[in-house]
A protein has these predicted regions:
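A broad, low-specificity signal for short, low-complexity segments enriched in glycine/proline
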Residues: 17-24, 76-80, 206
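Local cysteine-cluster metal-coordination motifs and their immediate loop/turn environment
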Residues: 63-79
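C-terminal scaffold of the Radical SAM
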Residues: 51, 55-58, 81-105, 110-271
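Generic hydrophobic-segment detector
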Residues: 10-17, 32, 66, 108-110, ...
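Short, compositionally biased low-complexity segments
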Residues: 13-17, 70-71, 249-253
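A short secondary-structure junction motif
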Residues: 28-31, 71, 80-81
Length: 271
């Protein structure tokens, strides 16, 4: 599979340089309202499964694995912090059941062209658990040849051998959670990972045939400055990733308890 490079024009940058919700899922979060209950969702699935949609397009599926061994203070994701890896087994059983419930409505063998595994930390799962998870999808769906099969990777919990397992399972795209390379920023958000560790993993990923590498970055974190973040950007661009996902940190400690561990006085000014 190859990923086509697209030119981003100045006009496009100007057009979309406005505040707005993150377009990270479909339907977007604001579509989920009380009026859209499980019955309505089931009817939508039935319409696809019974031929109500002529020539349905391939599916794009996101799978969430919420487990992490340690807490990143900036995180607003759905997560479970634990070092007890046995907690993953019942979650995976329920996830398999969820897949079965969906295929009962839409039918077995629907084509998936995009499968993304996010979290949480996907590498919290053992190699066998990852194999089991992928077997569920291969049994219930048809994974399109040349599809995009992506997994989020925490550089602190993966090594070159683990990347080999991910390649063996059919993943062709990796997303590395970097956020910032500055040691002071990493300490402030409780996510310490040396830049050299990420560099080595990116090199190992390319050697194992991964076709697309993404790096996640966050601006607005505590102890960041324009100068320090410029250094991070220089290090990231030197890696020549295929994609950079750059997010603004949203400091909402009243909603997300972990963010209360971040000292407000250490947040950079928006000016």
């Amino acid at each position: 599979m190859t990923f086509a490079a697209e030119t981003v024009s100045d006009e496009m940058l100007t057009r979309f340089d406005v505040p707005g919700p993150r377009y990270t899922s479909y339907p977007t979060a604001d579509r989920f309202v009380e009026a859209f209950a499980s019955e309505e969702y089931g009817l939508a699935l039935d319409q696809r499964g019974r031929g109500g949609i002529a020539r349905p397009s391939p599916l794009s599926v996101y799978v969430h694995i919420p487990f992490c061994e340690s807490l990143c203070y900036y995180c607003a994701c759905n997560k479970i912090i634990t070092k007890h890896h046995d907690r993953a087994a019942p979650y995976l059983r329920y996830l398999s059941r969820e897949v079965d419930l969906h295929t009962q409505r839409i039918g077995v063998g629907q084509t998936i062209s995009q499968l993304h595994l996010g979290g949480g930390s996907l590498t919290f799962l053992s190699d066998d658990e990852l194999r089991e998870l992928m077997a569920v999808f291969k049994r219930s769906f048809k994974l399109a040849p040349g599809g995009e099969y992506s997994i989020e990777v925490d550089p602190r919990t993966v090594d070159a051998a683990r990347l080999g397992v991910l390649a063996e399972l059919g993943f062709n795209r990796l997303s590395f959670g970097v956020q910032d390379f500055d040691p002071a920023v990493q300490k402030a958000v409780h996510r310490v990972q040396p830049a050299e560790q990420v560099f080595a993993l990116v090199e190992a990923a390319r050697a194992r045939g991964f076709e697309s590498i993404n790096v996640d970055l966050i601006y607005g974190l505590p102890r960041q400055s324009p100068e320090s973040f410029d250094r991070t950007l220089a290090q990231v661009t030197a890696l020549r990733p295929d994609r950079i996902a750059l997010y603004a940190y949203a400091h909402l400690p009243e909603r997300f308890k972990p963010q209360r561990r971040i000292a407000t006085v250490e947040l950079p000014s928006a000016a």
